[in-house]
Curated annotation (Swiss-Prot):
This is Large ribosomal subunit protein bL25. Belongs to the bacterial ribosomal protein bL25 family. GO terms for molecular function: structural constituent of ribosome. SUPFAM superfamilies: Ribosomal protein L25-like. One of its GO terms (cellular component) is ribosome. It comes from Bacillus caldolyticus. The gene is ctc.
Length: 59
């Protein structure tokens, strides 16, 4: 089963920007990877909840 989570890249690290993202229903995050540059992203809370509901099922 493939699960897709839509995320948008963010470039601003300011606290005020993070507050604005949260107040608009977003969740700021950072993607880490081996031999890959870190990426600052954000997802909507509704989208994340949807993915967790769909992917959280047991067989």
């Amino acid at each position: 089963m493939e699960i897709v989570l839509e995320a948008k890249e963010r470039t601003d690290k300011k606290r005020s920007t993070l507050r604005r993202i949260r107040s608009q229903g977003g969740i700021p995050a950072i993607l880490y990877g081996k031999k890959v540059e870190n990426k600052m992203i954000f997802v909507t809370a509704a989208e994340l909840e949807k993915v967790l509901r769909e992917g959280g099922r047991t067989s």
